[in-house]
């Protein structure tokens, strides 16, 4: 694995995690 694929994987994880936090926040958790 090169640094580009690692950076993309980390970016997708952070994006999906922040998106789920926004959804949970709007649902009134």
Curated annotation (Swiss-Prot):
SUPFAM superfamilies: PetN subunit of the cytochrome b6f complex. The 4 large subunits of the cytochrome b6-f complex are cytochrome b6, subunit IV (17 kDa polypeptide, PetD), cytochrome f and the Rieske protein, while the 4 small subunits are PetG, PetL, PetM and PetN. The complex functions as a dimer. Disulfide bonds: none annotated. It is a single-pass membrane protein. Component of the cytochrome b6-f complex, which mediates electron transfer between photosystem II (PSII) and photosystem I (PSI), cyclic electron flow around PSI, and state transitions. InterPro entries: Cytochr_b6-f_cplx_su8_sf, Cytochrome_b6-f_cplx_su8. It comes from the Eukaryota. GO terms for molecular function: electron transporter, transferring electrons within cytochrome b6/f complex of photosystem II activity. This is Cytochrome b6-f complex subunit 8. Belongs to the PetN family. The keyword Transmembrane applies. HAMAP family: Cytb6_f_PetN. One of its GO terms (cellular component) is chloroplast thylakoid membrane. The chain crosses the membrane at residues 3-23.
